[in-house]
From Swiss-Prot:
Entry keyword annotation includes Zinc-finger: yes
Subunit annotation: Component of the small ribosomal subunit (SSU). Mature yeast ribosomes consist of a small (40S) and a large (60S) subunit. The 40S small subunit contains 1 molecule of ribosomal RNA (18S rRNA) and 33 different proteins (encoded by 57 genes). The large 60S subunit contains 3 rRNA molecules (25S, 5.8S and 5S rRNA) and 46 different proteins (encoded by 81 genes).
Record protein name field: Small ribosomal subunit protein eS27B
Pfam name, any one: Ribosomal_S27e
Chief place of localization: cytoplasm
Length: 82
């Protein structure tokens, strides 16, 4: 009997579809972001799955709002993944 799937060397596409704990190497899917405020250009570090609304420290503009999973960035904000 020949195996159709190689279990020791899975493809990147099949690993991306799996649950984070079912992959060959376990790891989180969350990350931190550097978000730039569109008004004052101040940079704030935000968690990707933030559960509270994050505001800019200097001008009090809302940078992201929480959803059920990932936080939704506000219109006009630019970001960079850390």
């Amino acid at each position: 009997m020949v195996l159709v799937q190689d279990l020791l060397h899975p493809t990147a596409a099949s690993e991306a579809r799996k649950h984070k704990l079912k992959t060959l190497v376990q790891g989180p899917r969350s990350y931190f972001l550097d978000v730039k405020c569109p008004g004052c250009l101040n940079i704030t570090t935000v968690f990707s799955h933030a559960q509270t609304a994050v505001t800019c420290e200097s001008c009090s503009t809302v940078l992201c709002t929480p959803t059920g999973g990932k936080a939704k960035l506000s219109e006009g904000t630019s970001f960079r993944r850390k």
